[in-house]
Amino acid sequence: MKLYNSASRKKEDFVPNHPDIVKMYTCGPTVYHFAHIGNLRSYIMEDVLEKYLRYAGYNVKRVMNITDVGHLTSDADEGEDKMLKGAKREHKSVMEIAKFYTDAFFSDCKKLNIKTPDVVEPATNCIDEYIKIITKLMDTGYAYFAGGNVYFDTSKLERYYIFNDFNADDLDVGVREGVEEDVNKRNKNDFVLWFTKSKFEDQALKWDSPWGVGYPGWHIECSGISMKHLGEDLDIHCGGIDNAFPHHTNEIAQSESYLGHKWCNYWMHVLHLNTNSGKMSKSKGEFLTVSLLEDKGYDPLAYRLFCLQSHYRKSLVFSWENLDNAQGTYNKLINRIAALKPAGEAVDEDAVAALKSKFTAALDNDLNTSLAVTALYDVLKYDTNDDTKLAVIADFDRVLSLSLIEKADARRAELKKQAVSGTSEFTVISESGESDAGIEALLKARANAKKAKNFAEADRIRDELKAQGIEVTDIPNGAKWKRI
């Protein structure tokens, strides 16, 4: 298995630190607002990664934080705590805001079939861990106290910019409009490890510390939570491209200065979901939620499929037209699987091996989900019995998590119910997924002839299709066809 490592800027063979476990850390949401579908693209990719590692036989422990304090509006050290901003917006307490939007986040994840990580830790639970790390950084000269805050001194590092090949447009960093720069820093890139009350008098959440009553910076939270649950080394750290700088850069700086050795081996970043006006962003007030997609009639799993059809290291352009296409593709996929007829036949193990080789080759190549979806379509076209196809589809869906078998079973039951009531519409399914209006018209004409008991005409149409190299199979309330 090869993964693209953002730190080395190349694909590398994946070799975990320990043979018995893969340690995986995911930057979780800042729970001051709903997650937008661009945020959720990252969590979909991370979900696929975890599930594929398990599929490949690894034992995985995945940890994710919930940021409920310390994440400022600049994404660096300037501005207001986002949690306080959310509380003011909705006239609620910070903890009320945190609980509501944490619950909303996991509700969205459930709709998208995103597995809950093994450990989910709110940042406010780990204050002692942050103080322990900061104290050692102060003692070893990597941190200093100024203006009421504790800062990490980036001038002490031989190398600070780890991900500096990213374009500025990709990273979207810099001081945002209306945000004042911190004049207490010795160096431009220094960052806050601990804020005291001297910074924000109205900060809602504060704790005692050796440096005064205050609260942790955003970056120290992920280091502390990761070390608490995963120890002093880490295999994979994931996040959106926005996290690469300054957040992940600062995590590496403080963690490796504290530990005295390399902290994480593989860094993986998901690129933006863009709209016609640019990157989807809560700070700009331009974002779409899973609930909004549902209100417009879309299945959240159609959005998951939309994400899987593109590689995670490519920017993905969202439009309603593109989502319409994904929903149509998803519906057709479910219909094609529903047209398969389980008959209790033996599974063809040779076919399984051939089909799985394409699927695993795709995902072994830096999680190429686009080719993995193509491998799924190959199953439907493969010359083997339907029981084998259904078994392989169920196997692939352990990773893709599109609820393919469940949705197909429901569709099959719906068609049978419609057949009994006589309210069903005739469904035409192409086994290859292609669309041909002429063939569909002939199949519907044949169905009408059969309904009128004009079997001679129905047979004539079947013969006409056969002469065109089309094989027809009748299914409940429809027909499926393929070229032979």
Predicted stretch roles:
Residues 8, 17-113, 477-481:
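N-terminal, positively charged nucleic-acid-binding surface of large information/translation enzymes
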Residues 54, 138, 466:
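Anion (oxyanion) recognition and catalysis
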Residues 279-281, 287-484:
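Structural preference for alpha-helix termini/caps and helix-kink/transition segments
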Residues 1-32, 47, 107, 127-341:
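Alpha-helical recognition segments enriched in aromatics with Gly/Pro capping
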Residues 63-69, 98-105, 115-130, 148-157:
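Short, glycine/charge-rich beta-strand/loop segments that flank catalytic centers
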Residues 87-93, 119-124, 212, 240:
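The substrate-binding groove and active-site-proximal loops of carbohydrate-active enzymes
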Residues 59-61, 141-147, 383, 471-473:
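Short, well-structured beta-strand/strand-turn elements
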